[in-house]
Amino acid sequence: MGPARTALPSRPLNPMTGLFLSAWLVFPLLLLGVCGGSGLLVRRVSGGAVSGVLLLPVGFALTVAVCTLGTSMTWLAPYAGGLAVVVALVGLVLERSSLHVAGRRVSGVVLYPAIAAFVAFAVFAAPVLLTGTPSWTGFGRIVDTAFQMAFAQHLAEAGRSVPIGNSSFNETILGLTGNGYPGGAQATLGAMAGVIRTDVPWCYQAFQAWAAAMGALALYALLRRAVAQPLMCCVGAAVASQPNILYDYALQGGIKELTTASLILLVAALLVERLPGPRSLRSSLALAPAIAAAVAAFSYGVTPWLGLLLPAAFVLSLLRPGGRMRTLASWGVLAIATLLLAIPSVISSIKLFGDLTTAVNGVVELGLGNLTAPIPEISSAGVWISNDYRFPLLAHASASHVFDALVIALAAIGVLYALRRRLWMVAAFGLATPIALTYWVAHGGPWIELKAYTITATMVLAMAFVGAGSLTSLARNRATIALKIAAWIGAIAVTGAVLYGNALTYHYISLAPAARYKQLAEIGERFAGVGPAFYPAFDEYAEYFLRKEHGYDLVKPPGLQVRAGAVNLPAGQFAYALDLNQLELSFVQRFPLLVITRSSIASRPPANFDLVDQTSEFQAWRRVRPASEVVLHLPLSGSPTERTHHFCRGLRASVRRAGAGSSVAYVPAGPRAELVPTDMTHPRYWRALGTEALRAYGAGAIEGSVQLGAGGTYEISMSGSVARPVTLYVDGHRAGSVANQERYPGQFLHFARLSLSAGTHRIRLSRGNAGVSPGSGDGPDTSSGVIGPLIFALDQPQNGRLMVVPGSDAGRVCTAHAGYQWIEVLAPGARAVS
């Protein structure tokens, strides 16, 4: 016998690792299986009219249609994901024999489209996938991303029903369901995430990447009908699926536009491969899921494109020799099948009829949205080398225009080539692209136009590669060699320009702090049903994670009652963070649960609240005693000298009015020191943001010293927002580091808890060079590098060091040389204790 083996203790899986695997392994595999099975079902029903390349995209379209149908009915919504899985299983069972055959025929025919799809998936996944955390992109850039996540969750749980109860989450949902907002992509995301029991935000980026991959497969199928070289088709499909303007917009929340682009491309690819005709009425059924899914994803917005492609296909099918009556019958079958699949989308879109009427007869004007200036039409050519689409193009404007001219020239050659070769549907696709865009520009404002540019860019790039491919396929002779070389150079140049532009976006895109939201999600689950809850900060994602508590935040606050003079804001503006001391007591007492971000300067909630949960980022406080216990709440700033004789007389009078047996509660303000970056040694190229903060550019450091009046354990935090790592050194020793922790103004980042002695300590805050990691660049948005005041706060008891004394001690407490967060008068019999 060998030596005995000692069993090693098993290590539990890190929750973030589990979420990452769920989002980036289980979820894509689920989509692969569901879309594959659904595609096989469509192939079976259509009599084999779906090619191998389009199997997954057609299955994706059917999945979108099924999930939209399922979420259109409240009672069926929770089972929409299961319904899509059942549909896929039916396809897998019916077509199981074809799977065995396909398994023995893996060749270059499969390899090239697979590479194109993989590249598209990887490019959209890279900013998150390479971090190893289940995050998402575009954090803090636009609140719409959170709203799309909320919509996806609601559709998967309750369909398009009107939400019950008041909360910021429900107000968002009411605004979306009330106006018929299209939800094909969101319904699919929510339903599929529900199948694996994973919250929508963790799966959001993977769904985006999958939608892009489906677009790449559709593009490959379209290109191979006009381009002879598989390599050119592969490159063209991979590149055209990620035009700069679409990539940038998708990484900042454009789930609707990315999905719609892929579905419109699928419709075009199916029409290019096979027009409805007299040979088989069933064959036209392959188109029905694609059209229905496109309508589900973008509602009436798909009309400018499909309104040109489908009539063109109809006319072309009737011009072909053969039985016209059977061709008409084939179109009739398609119309009926499409209508059946699209009924939920049509019904929900009725609420948008007013917008449709405006779009036909006038201009749908939504202003600039989150743009700082209108984006020109030329961006729809596919090359728009920018690190953030919201800002005007400056550094690479000339280069972008040169490459766009090249793209347009190649696209024009592609249209001429298609006409010459009588590839009528390819030509119709190329001609419909600028016509549809012209309509959008004529009937929409800057924000609406942007959405059209994102979708159009995929089509223009596709036709550019048709043009390049047509030149490379010319007969070999001396006269054509130069054209062939020029065509390949042009294709490579366009590819390089698109990839370079997207690399800039990757470099400057923001990432959500995943671990932070995992903590908030856990609080949301732990206190589900305890509400309404209040989250006194501007954070659109808090609405989602606190939805089960009917949470409110400052994005959609519930009629804030701000204490007079507490917040100095110009009329019409809002606060990004509020201290509870800045709010009226009656307002705070409306909420049984308070969820607040941990901060060294935050005030403790009123005395009838107890701390019931705490993480490194958040605290949950529950109202455990009646609001009537707190008779008076007097907010203070922590200064020992702020309480005047008049103030103390008023406090004693309030105690007398409260009656015999009343008491006084107060919270001593803990010792703390503050370092202001603008007063510290800092690089000259780090410019001031106001009087206290710096906007950091590039690498550099700030240095100074802090004087601590007492020794002990200090919580070190900073008001700011950072992307690339920022490291804190105390007396030459590394104390802590933060990265990818962007925040809105007035919110804090936590560096470390350190045991420090009384006296002077040298402080250095260092910011390194940008690396290859996503979001490490310095874009025009300031949130990637805001260095605010450093706070050194002496550790306090978790429950806020609440002190309660008899009312007779009110004078002593008030006149003591000590700073307080607040003082409260408690009613007789109040049970709050120190």
What are these regions (language model features)?
Residues G2-G108, R590, G829:
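Membrane-embedded, hydrophobic transmembrane alpha-helices
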Residues A312-P321, V333-L340, S380-W424, S470:
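Hydrophobic, aromatic-rich transmembrane alpha-helices
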Residues V494-A497, H507-Y517, I523-P570, F587, ...:
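Short periplasmic/luminal acceptor-recognition loop of GT-C membrane glycosyltransferases, typified by
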Residues L285-I291, W331-L341, A462, A468-N502, ...:
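Signature aromatic-anchored transmembrane alpha helix within multi-pass, membrane-resident enzymes
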Residues F118-L263, L393:
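Active-site lumenal/periplasmic loops and adjacent helix-entry segments of GT-C-fold
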Residues A122-V123, A297-V302, S345-V346, G467-S470, ...:
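Transmembrane alpha-helical segments
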Residues L54-C67, V87, L92, A116-A126, ...:
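Membrane-embedded helix bundles of polyisoprenyl
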Residues A146, A209, E257, A261-L263, ...:
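Hydrophobic/aromatic-rich transmembrane helices and adjacent perimembrane loops
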